[in-house]
């Protein structure tokens, strides 16, 4: 099945992908009230996933791929067959940052791949309290714990390895010990670097303004 045939658009030709978000279903009017957005297109229309310039919305690509099917055949099976043809392994890094349709796409795609490896750290996920809707971080029962996350991935058919990458090459022994004792996260260090945990309450501005100090903030 093709995307064009799925939406009964036989002559559709895409022009790539854009990073612009698609029009939301509801928007605020001048009075601050939520009203229907006339630019919104329903999910059963190709224009829900494609701009007027025939570019796919990046934000809805996974959702689109999941629904294109015809009988027992699907776009996911077709994509997996091509990946298997050209690649021995499919490697996905930062797996913990995938959720909702992106997460579902990976899980369903994996069922048809010859070999796939997912690498990720639950405790480094970028999902916050504001955007934690959907799998694997939100279920009808509530938020998902580390144990729940591991069980969810295991139930999807994956073998779980929690030890191979348990040693950090980035963090020092002191930092790892601090994390383990305060947050009860099982992490150790390879000991390749020196580093200490310090409180910068009184020198925060000096640290931020000092270009000689490497920081993970902007």
Where are these regions (language model features)?
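The feature marks helicase ATPase cores and/or their adjacent C-terminal helical subdomains
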Residues: 1-218
């Amino acid at each position: 099945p093709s995307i064009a045939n799925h939406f009964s658009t036989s002559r559709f030709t895409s022009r790539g992908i854009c990073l612009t978000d698609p029009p939301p279903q509801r928007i605020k009017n001048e009075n601050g009230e939520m009203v229907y957005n006339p630019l919104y297109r329903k999910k059963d229309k190709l224009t829900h996933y494609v701009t007027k310039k025939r570019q796919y919305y990046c934000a809805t690509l996974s959702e689109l791929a999941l629904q294109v099917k015809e009988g027992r055949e699907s776009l996911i099976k077709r994509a997996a067959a091509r990946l298997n043809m050209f690649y021995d392994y499919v490697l996905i890094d930062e797996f913990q940052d995938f959720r909702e349709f992106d997460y579902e796409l990976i899980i369903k795609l994996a069922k048809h791949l010859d070999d796939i490896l997912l690498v990720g750290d639950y405790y480094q996920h970028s999902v916050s309290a504001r955007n934690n809707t959907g799998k694997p971080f939100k279920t009808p029962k509530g938020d998902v714990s580390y144990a729940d996350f591991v069980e969810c991935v295991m139930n999807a058919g994956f073998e779980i390895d929690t030890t191979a990458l348990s040693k950090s090459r980035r963090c020092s022994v002191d930092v790892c010990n601090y994390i383990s004792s305060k947050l009860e996260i099982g992490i150790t260090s390879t000991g390749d670097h020196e580093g200490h945990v310090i409180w910068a309450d009184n020198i925060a501005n000096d640290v931020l303004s000092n270009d000689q100090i490497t920081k993970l903030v902007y």
